[in-house]
Amino acid sequence: VTDGAKVANIVLFWADRIPSDWQPIAAGKSLRVAAEVPVNFGDPRREETKSEQSVVVSGYGAVVVSNDYRNTSLLSGGTGVALIDQAMNGAIVLMSGTTKVQPWGVQKFTWDKASRQLKSAWVNTQVSCPNAIPTVSEASQRFYCVGAYLGSWTIESLDWRTGGGHFRKFMGMLPRYNSFYASTQLTGDGGLIYGSFDGAVYVPAAH
């Protein structure tokens, strides 16, 4: 999972039995915590990062995407009125694919079984996944997300192992292509489907 720290951390927990020789990673930390590593998208000088979508996990790898929306100060910060705050957040998500607002960055972490440490494997700052929950194909070892580029909603894909091999498919600029924090799923026929502001969007397999 990712936490709510100012610079977000990716946090791993022992799922079942905690190793008998395991010690807390820091004073005051639960033994259940296996790792806690900053998500900085390759820039250790970053003073703030956000990653609010679900972490995508396959094998010993975990990928997070940036939700560091830009130029949203007028709509940020709670008013204390739930309806107004929800409307403001919705407005940010609606604009999250625009060039002035969209976040940039995808980062993969890998668990090293031998050293029992979580390490950054790769970073790609040329890809934007504004709000969709990404997915991964274990068969093809490809990462997918609903992205944005030049004001258009897109499908973005990267090599899960290296972060390279970038592929982009343009979908359109209309809100109907805005994933609005919905999940992305691969279909049995080689296509992709995701929820959007206006319903479900199906992308057939490329031939």
Label each region the model flagged.
Residues V1-D16, D21-P24, T187:
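Mobile, glycine-rich extracellular loop/lid and propeptide segments
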Residues T2-F13, P38-G80:
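Repeat-solenoid scaffold signature
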Residues F13-D16, F109-W111, E156-L158, Y202-A206:
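Hydrophobic/aromatic beta-strand positions that recur at structurally equivalent sites within the blades
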Residues F13-E48, F109-V127, G163-G172:
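Blade-edge beta-strand/turn elements of extracellular beta-propeller
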Residues G42-G59, Q126-V136, P175-L186:
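Repeated scaffold domains used in trafficking and secretory/extracellular systems
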Residues Y60-L174:
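Loop/turn-rich, solvent-exposed surfaces of beta-rich toroidal or solenoidal domains
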Residues Y177-H207:
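Blade-level signature of beta-propeller repeat domains, shared across WD40, Kelch, NHL, RCC1
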